[in-house]
Amino acid sequence: MDHRYISICGMTEKELLANFKEGINELAEANGDTEEATIAKLKARYDGYHFEENTVGIYNPFSVLNTLAKSRYDDYWFKANTHTFLFDILKKHDYCITEFSKAQIKANMMNNVDFNPFLDIYLSGYLTIKSYDERFKNYQLGIPNKEIEEGILNILQPLFKQN
């Protein structure tokens, strides 16, 4: 990805704080939290997307805006999507949900979804870049935040138990 566009699909914490101070304070008041605690909760639930190594985290704007508008935390992005795509990939390749924290992709394969199904999962927003090994040119992927982690566990786990 071109470094100039790493935050095009979301917002940085700096942008969040600069543009949504009033909404953050209203959310804090509605939930009986301090502003600092509210920012920490927003970060844990909706931040964590990285589209390139060693970059600032990107917040999911859909979930942040819904949280601020409704003054309550929820899995807005996860609930707004159908997850059959993810379920089908995991089933087809016999992946376990726990493998998400061990997913790796070679840098030269970042544009080749046929080679590694985890790339498709990453491109769909369920995984993000956690680290990069310069020596081996290898990306370590992982679940970006609590919204995705809880969504995967709450929605997909029962599907796997049924099959």
Where are these regions (language model features)?
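Phosphate-binding site recognition
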Residues: 1-163
